[in-house]
Amino acid sequence: MGPIDTSQRLARLRELMQERKVDVYVVPSEDSHQSEYIAHCDGRREFISGFTGSAGCAIVSMTKAALSTDGRYFNQAAKQLDNNWILLKRGFENMPTWQEWTAEQAEGGKVVGVDPSLITASDARNLSETIKKCGGSLLGVQENLVDLVWGAERPARPSEKVALHPIEFAGKSFEEKISDLRKELQKKKCAGFVISMLDEIAWLFNLRGNDIPYNPVFFAYAIITQSTADLYIDEEKLPAEVKNYLGDKVSLKPYSSIFEDAKVLGQSAQNKSDGETSTKPPQKFLISTRASWSLSLALGGEKNVEEVRSPITDAKAIKNEAELEGMRACHIRDGAALSEYFAWLENELVNKKTVLNEVDASDKLEQIRSKHQHFVGLSFDTISSTGPNAAVIHYKAERNNCSIIDPKAVYLCDSGAQYLDGTTDTTRTLHFGEPTEMEKKAYTLVLKGLISIDTAVFPKGTTGFALDAFARQYLWKEGLDYLHGTGHGVGSYLNVHEGPIGLGTRVQYSEVAIAPGNVISDEPGYYEDGVFGIRIESPFFPHLLINLPFLLTPIIDIIMAKEVKTTHKFGEKPWLGFEHVTMTPLCQKLINPSLLSDVEKKWVNDYHTEIWEKTSKYFENDELTRNWLKRETQPI
């Protein structure tokens, strides 16, 4: 998708800024719940800039406009921004951060405005300090100025029905989860927890929604104290079944009343803290470090709130046995769907010489997935990309603006699905013709990195920050790299990107250790701008090692962490490894076996044997896919 002309939108925004005495206006990507993926009505940064990627921040002054984003989107942003915009490439040497660029525009006492519901309290404090150093000031502007520019064309806020998430898949009742949360609050000596993250609320109450595309969440807030559980949600979203399920254990309140109630809580906390009684109960309320500035202000700010990494996000990241079993099961079905798709695609392109574009292909994949048990929908917009498009890390094919798939070029498919028993995210890179030696080398180096993560054994307490280099080492030896993280947490029929764990150089990945029950993607890659892109992605579980005589034992892809027993136990620490769950073959044609060690070849062969054993039963009456799968899982 090419650029749109943003001149009129920027002109109108600047008029509104001038009326409110705002010199610089910040437009974050997130919604008021700090969601990574947002409803269409919250796409303010996309509306004002024309950039459609999921991450970034727009800043508009009276004479300039800038868009900051990360390495996943550099190519896309360069294509989508018109000549009104400057692209700030996050992480590039000598390139200012968006905060630094904003502060530069505020020199000389200028005012920077931002909607306080769209920025976290900690980010607001840090931005304010950066701006002050340049002589400017930060102002929370309650009325969103981009919404005023958008006007009647802004989409309505969705209000989809909420559904129960059955205990057979959740593995734990909402009453147990709330009880566990209250124990955490007691440990921290806090009066309660004000919850704003949508996936945390969905997980806590074992409910799922459909307010944000691809993410089974719903707009709500919650407040949990030692004696009450309040859910702030528009009641028309709740069927009778859900109301009966929540019963008298949860009080339902209007979504719009959260800030009014937060102010009351803040005033009450302040009044109690001003008293003289030595036995007064704890006064502070917990909020997540991801909670909005406006929510913190409503509670009375730092004197009444303690910002912490949410105890719910930590609990949610460690899947219980029902959730882990669901992830295993849905990845087998999803792997079967992908094999059927790749077999179909090869037959259409190579044997039938069918002309297919990238969207035609991704539509077929969704159709195939939808036949499988517990399918609900996609977990993100499928990246179906041929040739040079595969070098755009988060490429999005548009129905009226996409490429014909070239069987003589690399084809990259990054896709996932939501099933009642789990969430999938798999990338496979294929070639239907004769790949070049460079393509095979790049693919094999990426594969070696994936294997290195998958076979890693490490002591308890190791972070994803520390493991990230395992995946990059073979590319680094060739002077190559990729501009995205190596992996992210994956939800259980929830958001496909889930914190707080992951593999990468983000600061947050150095703060939280990998733990048994985590589900993480393993997705190294290599991209040659304008030529091709290679990515292999497979989620896995960390696990506890049991009697491993040596370190390189094959376990694969989305990966699950679990504890394992090693021959030795230095420092009496538990040791962890990974269990793979993705069941989709690698592309044999792109592997250069001469670049693999004997151990790595065994890993590939064992992985492919497991895929055949677990998924071939789906193709007893499908000769095309069965033959394709048989060929692709042969030993190398």
From Swiss-Prot:
Binds 2 manganese ions per subunit. It comes from Ajellomyces capsulatus (strain H143). The keyword Manganese applies. It catalyses: Release of any N-terminal amino acid, including proline, that is linked to proline, even from a dipeptide or tripeptide. It comes from the Eukaryota. Belongs to the peptidase M24B family. SUPFAM superfamilies: Creatinase/aminopeptidase, Creatinase/prolidase N-terminal domain. Gene3D superfamilies: Creatinase/methionine aminopeptidase superfamily, Creatinase/prolidase N-terminal domain. GO terms for cellular component: cytoplasm. The lineage of its organism: Eukaryota, Fungi, Dikarya, Ascomycota, Pezizomycotina. CDD domains: APP. This is Probable Xaa-Pro aminopeptidase P. One of its GO terms (molecular function) is metalloaminopeptidase activity. The gene is AMPP.
